[in-house]
Amino acid sequence: MNCFKILHRIKTGKEGFMVFYISLFLILWLAAGFAVGMKQVYVDQLFDKAVIERLEKEANDHGHADRMIKQRVLYIAAVTVSGFISVYYEMKTIPQRRNIRKIEKNIMKLNQAKKRRMKRK
């Protein structure tokens, strides 16, 4: 019964609104980071074998980097805590990804043209 009175005071007072908005902000912060982490790991295939090998070559000097590279859950947790910062950097890379897709399409067209030439011979 006493807990309900305390909760009622928090809800009705100015402190209650402040706590409510801070908690709402933190929930949104963590949800945004979690969504970006899940997208990077499972949609973008960040932990693909080729990517892991490249990251391991770059991280030869850092012993702690291996833990971060190999454990998906640890990576998702770190991105979750970073919140909207990770969302910002994810949005910042969109134009670069578009350019990469254009380059990949051009390479595919060149490969198809090469196959056609090989079939003619």
Swiss-Prot record:
Subcellular location: Cell membrane
Keyword Transmembrane: yes
Keyword Transmembrane helix recorded: yes
Membrane topology type: Multi-pass membrane protein
Record's keyword terms, sorted: Cell membrane, Membrane, Transmembrane, Transmembrane helix
Predominant localisation class: membrane
Gene Ontology CC, one term: plasma membrane
Membrane spanning stretches: 16-36, 74-94
Protein name, entry field: Uncharacterized membrane protein YndK
Underlying gene: yndK
